Amino acid sequence: MEVVTNGSMHFDPQIHTLPFVRARSSFLLAVILASASAFTALGGTRQLHLSLRAHADRLEANVRNSHLKSIEIIQAFLCLATWAEVPTILCRDRTWSYVSHAISLAIELRLDQPLPHCIQSDPMYDQGYNELLIRNAHRTCLLLFIHDRVGIILTYVSG
């Protein structure tokens, strides 16, 4: 997780440790592992990447079908949007789907609030992680805004 948290604006190295991510969201963990396995310098192979990506896709379908909501799920969709493979055909680009679903989850969880309810009800909130969890929610909300704006700008530029 150290490699991921040091080079990514998505995660906070103080809370996004391997035990934290493992305990909170198997979907986020699978997405991180699938994204990291795409880079052979980190020890990934093509077969490993395909297996992890297929697992992440199965978990994504489960998350959507079960209507699950959490900040970690939003972060997983942001990672999928950020590290998505460039499709050979534009109609296969799923970035818009990842970002739009993440935005709808953020709206439902009210991440734009100064103190989102999902943070107040978090078991870690009472364990001294208040500021880190609030900052995590606000960072996620800001990244969604950036993804949305960049997508609109690219749409205007490209056509």
Q: Residue locations for each model-derived region?
A:
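Acidic, Ser/Thr/Pro-rich intrinsically disordered transcriptional activation regions
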Residues: 1-80, 88-91, 103-108, 112, ...
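Fungal transcription factor middle regulatory core
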Residues: 104, 109-159
